[in-house]
Amino acid sequence: MSETKRVRVRYAPSPTGFLHIGNARTALFNYLFARHNDGDFIIRIEDTDAKRNIADGEESQMTNLKWLGMDWDEGVDVPGKYGPYRQSERQSIYEPLIQELLDKDLAYKCYCTEEELDAEREKQKANGEMPRYSGKCRHLTKEQQAEKEAQGFKPSIRFKVPANETITFNDMVKDDVSFESNGIGDFVIAKKDGIPTYNFAVAVDDHLMEISHVLRGDDHISNTPKQILIYNAFGWEPPIFGHMTLIVNESRRKLSKRDGSIIQFIEQYRDLGYLPEALFNFIAMLGWSPEGEEEIFSKEEFIKMFDPKRLSKSPALFDNVKLTWVNNQYVKKLPLNDVVELSLPHLQKAGVVSAELNQAELDWVHKLVSLYHEQMSYGAEIVPLSEMFFADAESITFDEEETAVLAEETVPTVISAFKKELEALEVLEAAEVKAAIKRVQKETGVKGKGLFMPIRIVTTGEMHGPELPLAIEVLGREKVLNRLDTWLKNN
């Protein structure tokens, strides 16, 4: 392909499911490559497998790509001169090209039933052979074909794979890759209903849409020789291919939609209150890295830096700890009002704050969220982080370490004195709480951890957490006194 040819890349999802983290990465790398080269980024919907398509699959793809911060130059919602951009609307384009291959004797009609093909595959497996079509229908005469059709058999169309050829291409990630044609077998390019198969439709669409580079997952690499053969059959120049390594989990296994340890879909991250800029940043580093040690970049910086030569040849590790860290870096930079906006729906969904808040209640939520602003990684995390603020005194339990602290003989004296100090305060404010703790220290002679730790454990139910006077202010006078009183009655 000429190096001066305009860069045109595509993300071509099938609407058979929602936007998955792996597909999002494919889209994102294509987007960055297009924008870096002042080229075109195209969204094409590959929806020819009608049985597997789901109602909201296409919408999920588009909505969540936009949410992540991507836009495109052509697609089902951005008309261009290379449309239609749904494969289901391109049947009239495919049919004459399939006929052209038949006319050139580069394809043939196959009347084999699924049962026959299954039996053939099983026999090959039993013999230790690689399953591939035997070519049974390749040499049928016109008369034999007519006889099959008279018997009611509908043909699929198979591509005639040339024998004894080596198909080689230079991959942007893997360098030179070769396949032997003898290992491929004649493959179907149109099903019995006339609908083209994936490999045929993709090759045709990529050519007619003038796609210059095909950047996709490693799981597609076995499709590439078939697509190159189709290009060669029509005398077309193939695009430049690049196959990204797969994403793996912490066990180094391919990321699977059945893997419950990792959230798989962009919509789920969105619903949990992750920031799109943070997720964009994290995904962009899955199998690609810039020079240097820095890991936080803006979209504009990624566009400026992106070079497919820096795509990793090793599988990309999906690191949940890194994901949390990256999101936290972005949350920390947000103004408090934005973090409250991110958190509030989750507090309401959990039922710990009302759906309709007055100003005093909203002010309280601001105070609550401010305690965890530096710690939070995503909106929904506010619920487990702040659960101590909503627990009843009777439901608070202490672990072994906390129980050991509360077993010290000075603890009842400290708790009793602190309760007395708070009862004298009409309003609990952090400064007043701090002063009250100092007075307890003076009165009891207990200081340091022996003073602060029992007060923290009894009032918050936790050994560690936000600054104690602030936490007590947010808890409120009634709740704190109730917890102190409950502990004293039980000990």
Curated annotation (Swiss-Prot):
UniProt keywords, alphabetically: Aminoacyl-tRNA synthetase, ATP-binding, Cytoplasm, Ligase, Metal-binding, Nucleotide-binding, Protein biosynthesis, Zinc
Details of cofactor binding: Binds 1 zinc ion per subunit.
InterPro entries in UniProt: aa-tRNA-synth_I_cd-bd, aa-tRNA-synth_I_codon-bd_sub2, aa-tRNA-synth_I_CS, aa_tRNA-synth_I_cd-bd_sf, Glu-tRNA-ligase_bac/mito, Glu/Gln-tRNA-synth, Glu/Gln-tRNA-synth_Ib_cat-dom, GluQ/Sye
Positions of ATP binding: 257
GO biological process, one term: glutamyl-tRNA aminoacylation
Top-rank lineage group of the source organism: Bacteria
Annotated compartments: Cytoplasm
A GO cellular component entry from the record: cytosol
Binding residues for Zn(2+): 110, 112, 137, 139
Motif ('HIGH' region): 13-23
GO terms assigned for molecular function: ATP binding; glutamate-tRNA ligase activity; tRNA binding; zinc ion binding
Cofactor annotation: Zn(2+)
Reactions catalysed: tRNA(Glu) + L-glutamate + ATP = L-glutamyl-tRNA(Glu) + AMP + diphosphate
PROSITE patterns per UniProt: AA_TRNA_LIGASE_I
Motif 'KMSKS' region in this chain: 254-258
Main location: cytoplasm
Annotated EC: 6.1.1.17
Family of the protein in this entry: Belongs to the class-I aminoacyl-tRNA synthetase family. Glutamate--tRNA ligase type 1 subfamily.
Biological role stated in the UniProt entry: Catalyzes the attachment of glutamate to tRNA(Glu) in a two-step reaction: glutamate is first activated by ATP to form Glu-AMP and then transferred to the acceptor end of tRNA(Glu).
Complexes and interactors: Monomer.
HAMAP family per UniProt: Glu_tRNA_synth_type1 (MF_00022)
Record protein name field: Glutamate--tRNA ligase
Species: Listeria monocytogenes serovar 1/2a (strain ATCC BAA-679 / EGD-e)
Name of the gene: gltX
